[in-house]
């Protein structure tokens, strides 16, 4: 059997990181639609039997009915494909949610917050969805497979081996326990970075977010194309998002003024299919105000500027001066040398202190 496994599309997300530049958030929401349409067209053109959507298809707080109508219209274009959706923490199945109130295409099955099984001729699909924005436990690790001769698929949204306290609120799952259940494939959502291995017959998979949501999601994004039988799983990553979020560093050490820095940023080779974060590094010889820089950046695809520079001064020499500035620097250097504070903390304190003592 062949399937597409996707998750974390987050339809109608506000894309706040893009709203600093004119209408880019709005454009990104249109790109969501285009990306989803490409998935459906691929399914249609390649006779894919199953579509697994492992949660966070949309943003419950922002979703518009017109967007749901658009999604559903595409579902209707692939009537021979069985579509299974397990709601996540951003799109839980509640009494007033679109999952509950909207009339979905007949080839769509939406799971609720109890483990359900859909039996097909050769494949049984098990699913579990959120009914709230949090899910601290579920029945998943107690599932008993009904027919082990068939291909058995589990779809859910959750945190695999989460560990930290915040992740324990989003359906915490344990890899070892999941493997013991005996599923041929486990389609997960929630983690926005893809986690799959085509070489090791991996059966517990995150496809990552379908399109990148921001600078914490660098690289290519898309869906998993899978082909499975009882002996093996064949997986392929299909890039869907035509845009990427990219970080680029600029060393300011040899730049003499803010005007020269603006010129340097505007000379960067910017690709139209990328969103850029410029990270300023090195030793600076002038004050940097990122809000001021934004006003003069000509490329709208430069979304964010982060200042990680350090002030270019000879701290040891200045600490010898017989004045308040010298006494301040000597105190900080003594603390650093005695390992009372680390180097990064010392640099931050020095920078703040020197600004105060100007």
Q: What do these predicted regions represent?
A:
Residues 4, 124-126, 224:
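Conserved beta-strand elements of the Class I
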Residues 22, 50, 59-205, 209-214:
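His/Asp/Glu-rich metal-coordinating catalytic cores
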Residues 119-122, 214-221, 313-316:
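Short, charged, surface-exposed secondary-structure boundary motifs
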Residues 230-358:
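Accessory, non-catalytic peripheral segments of nucleic-acid enzymes
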Residues 1-69, 340, 344, 348-358:
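N-terminal active-site segment of His-dependent metallophosphoesterases
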Residues 189, 194-258:
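A conserved active-site cap/scaffold subdomain adjacent to cofactor or substrate pockets
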